[in-house]
Design a protein with these regions (language model features):
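Short Pro-Cys-Gly-centered "Cys-loop" motif that presents a nucleophilic cysteine in a tight turn
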Residues: 1-62, 66, 75-265
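Short acidic-rich active-site patches of cyclic nucleotide enzymes
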Residues: 69
Length: 265
């Protein structure tokens, strides 16, 4: 299935989401969170080898780091969006793999993004991104969660490593209004980063291929048809356990749904 081309933002602003491969946690303790914040800080405040400032690669308007995924509201400046996100992902994955003595992919192969073309949606996303921990049951209030950019808005003098262009946000909406809105739940009509069934199926395929390559050295899911039954069944069970449905396994491997059902039950 061909990948759908990313939509281009008229404003240069995008909502980006990165998620751990197989939805695994990508932040295990505070040191991990701080490392990622530092990487974001370096993106907006780059320096050359001698420590002299370079033009900023991007503007970041808000972020939120959750245990197995993260959100960014970002505008690319001197580099393409894909290059910026790739740079962030590689820097963090290198740190994470070294610290935890692991190999292979850390993030899903393809990050999610959507263009932000109007002011109303920009404000909706500021609220949505900061409300993620509340919606996920990790905090009662936006201000209680330590790993989002909200502290940069509410208490900038307490922020140890500023990342966001908060002034660009408060030039569009007053701080008083933002504070009153940020803990107000979004309506169900505020659709944020929805993806079609085809896009979800494509992401499952990419996750499965990465999983098979990393753990079993298998580059094509249809290779499972030629494996000894015991090994094939063990791999199918592992893939099903990571969340791939029997229907999707059948489509990708060429095995019948009945065969897969017997293998994973």
């Amino acid at each position: 299935m061909a990948r759908k081309a990313r939509e281009t933002s008229l404003t240069g602003i995008y909502h980006v989401m990165l998620r751990g491969i197989n939805r695994q946690d990508i932040f295990l303790d505070s040191e991990d969170y701080w490392k990622f914040v530092k990487i974001l800080h370096q993106q907006v405040n780059p320096k050359d080898e001698l420590g002299s400032p370079l033009p900023s690669k991007c503007d970041i308007y808000s972020y939120c780091l959750m245990p197995n995924h993260l959100h960014l509201l970002i505008r690319n400046r001197t580099e393409e969006l894909g290059s910026i996100v790739k740079s962030i992902g590689i820097a963090y994955a290198s740190y994470f793999n070294k610290r935890y003595e692991r190999v292979g992919h850390l993030f899903q192969d393809r990050f999610r993004s959507e263009p932000v073309n109007d002011m109303n949606y920009f404000v909706t996303l500021i609220r949505y991104i900061h409300q993620n921990p509340v919606a996920g049951g990790l905090a009662k209030r936006v201000e209680d969660y330590p790993w989002s950019s909200w502290i940069e808005f509410e208490s900038p003098t307490k922020c140890q490593m500023p990342v966001c262009a908060t002034g660009a946000v408060t030039n569009r909406i007053s701080m008083d209004e933002l504070k009153s809105l940020v803990n107000e739940p979004l309506s169900k009509a505020a659709v944020v980063l929805e993806f079609s069934k085809e896009e979800r199926d494509q992401q499952v395929e990419e996750d499965l291929r990465a999983f098979l390559t990393t753990h079993f050295g298998i580059t094509d899911p249809q290779e499972l048809c030629d494996l000894p039954e015991s090994k094939r069944d063990a791999i199918l069970q592992a893939a099903h356990h990571m969340g791939v449905s029997i229907r999707r396994l059948a489509q990708l491997t060429g095995l019948t749904a009945y065969t897969i059902h017997k293998s994973v039950r």
